């Protein structure tokens, strides 16, 4: 689960990470009534969306007066912000964060993420803050260091001294920030905390000028206070609907809807669709315990996307029985009067019974025995 920048800063502030003082606004009038609480000659006005690249897209402005800040907020509210992370359709700005300006001496990058190879958190630090860290890694890899940590290992600050020639005082302050975000990471079951930039001010303080936090969806049941931060306006409505039925759904830009059981098989299915010259419209994993009702809801979610011109169902029956899936497919197809081409490939537990159910349904369902054959058939139907 993602949250907004202003929410991430509120979380970090609770764990003693310094952040600029600010407030969130949904209208220019709110700025007029709240801006007096900020003790600054300049104000930073930031559009709040769940995507990076806001600055380049015009979503971050420096205001030199309260009146200018008010005007920036007025301009931003309701605008559609298109960044490299939003896709071409962009995201509508519904909230704006106004904060005190900071006197910046130097910008750094600091994040805490899960390393999939090590299966534990690692710190990433760079002297090139305020930039896309992927670009830094590509163009200046020597300016990035990683700190492998576990519960028995402290933050190895010696790497900061040897790699970036920081003073003992700077290292101590950065180490304190790192320890505080580690505490926040563990306490909230986060999957990522990113401070970019971590700013050293002219007075020598270190503050989080921007912050991003992602949380582990599987641990949200333990954190009702974090669930309250969820902004459904920032999420894809189909993904929200899918979560209600225990389905894992990610919307994509293609024309072939996919219904698969298992994340690995789902990715392989999308790959082979691309291999045969088409694009998947979604990732949809129905899991190992799907019922007829779940399958019906999965079809509804897939077909709610107007770009879908055909559907490929690829099921390998292990825990899940193919006859149950087949019954669900038939029931859903009849209930919804599915008009787009439908290719179904069943393999595994009770697959013969499943194929018989499909054949005797009287519906125009195209059967396939192999994944490659199924992909070619649906691509041919769509094209």
Curated annotation (Swiss-Prot):
Annotated GO MF terms:
ATP binding; magnesium ion binding; succinate-CoA ligase (ADP-forming) activity; succinate-CoA ligase (GDP-forming) activity
Q: What is this protein called?
A: Succinate--CoA ligase [ADP-forming] subunit beta
Protein's GO biological process: succinyl-CoA metabolic process; tricarboxylic acid cycle
User: What does the sequence similarity comment in the record state about its family?
Assistant: Belongs to the succinate/malate CoA ligase beta subunit family.
Cofactors per UniProt? Answer: Mg(2+)
Which top EC class applies here? ligase
Q: Where does substrate bind?
A: 261, 318-320
Query: What NCBIfam families does its record include?
Result: PRK00696.1, sucCoAbeta
Q: Give the record's pathway.
A: Carbohydrate metabolism; tricarboxylic acid cycle; succinate from succinyl-CoA (ligase route): step 1/1
Q: Where does ATP bind?
A: 46, 53-55, 99, 102, 107
The residues covered by the ATP-grasp domain are 9-241
Name the GO cellular-component terms: cytosol; succinate-CoA ligase complex
Q: What is the lineage of its organism?
A: Bacteria, Pseudomonadati, Pseudomonadota, Alphaproteobacteria, Rickettsiales
Catalytic activity field = succinate + ATP + CoA = succinyl-CoA + ADP + phosphate; GTP + succinate + CoA = succinyl-CoA + GDP + phosphate
Please indicate if the UniProt record lists Nucleotide-binding as a keyword.
yes
Q: Which PROSITE patterns match?
A: ATP_GRASP, SUCCINYL_COA_LIG_3
Q: Which domain of life is it from?
A: Bacteria
């Amino acid at each position: 689960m993602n949250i907004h920048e202003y929410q991430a800063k509120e979380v970090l502030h609770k764990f003693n990470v310094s952040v600029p003082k600010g407030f969130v606004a949904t209208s220019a009038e709110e700025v007029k009534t709240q801006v007096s609480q900020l003790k600054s000659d300049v104000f930073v006005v930031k559009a709040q969306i769940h995507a990076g690249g806001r600055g380049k897209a015009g979503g971050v402005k420096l205001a030199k007066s309260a009146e200018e800040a008010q005007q920036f907020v007025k301009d931003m509210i309701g605008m559609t912000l298109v960044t490299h992370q939003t896709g071409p359709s962009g995201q509508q700005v519904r909230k704006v964060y106004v904060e005190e300006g900071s006197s910046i001496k130097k910008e750094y990058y600091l994040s805490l993420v899960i390393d999939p190879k090590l299966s534990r958190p690692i710190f990433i630090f760079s002297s090139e803050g305020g930039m896309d860290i992927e670009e830094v890694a590509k163009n200046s890899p020597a300016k990035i260091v990683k700190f492998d940590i576990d519960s028995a290992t402290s933050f190895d600050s010696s790497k900061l001294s040897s790699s970036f020639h920081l003073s003992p005082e700077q290292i101590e302050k950065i180490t304190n920030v790192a320890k505080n975000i580690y505490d926040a990471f563990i306490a909230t079951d986060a999957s990522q905390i990113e401070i970019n930039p971590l700013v050293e001010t002219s007075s020598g303080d270190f503050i989080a000028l921007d912050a991003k936090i992602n949380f582990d969806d599987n641990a949200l049941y333990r954190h009702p206070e974090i669930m309250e931060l969820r902004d459904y306006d920032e999420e894809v409505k189909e993904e929200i609907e899918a979560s209600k039925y225990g389905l894992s759904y990610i919307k994509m830009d293609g024309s072939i809807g996919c219904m698969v059981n298992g994340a690995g098989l789902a990715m392989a299915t999308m790959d082979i669709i691309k291999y045969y010259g088409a694009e998947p419209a979604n990732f949809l994993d129905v899991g190992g315990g799907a019922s007829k009702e779940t399958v019906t809801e999965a079809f509804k979610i897939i077909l709610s996307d107007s770009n879908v011109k055909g559907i490929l169902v690829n099921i390998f029956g292990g825990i899940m029985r193919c006859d149950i899936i087949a019954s669900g497919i038939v029931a859903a197809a009849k209930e919804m009067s599915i008009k787009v081409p439908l290719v179904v490939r069943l393999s595994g537990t009770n697959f013969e019974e499943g194929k018989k159910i499909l054949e005797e349904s009287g519906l125009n369902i195209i059967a396939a025995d192999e994944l490659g054959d199924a992909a070619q058939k649906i691509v041919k139907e769509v094209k």
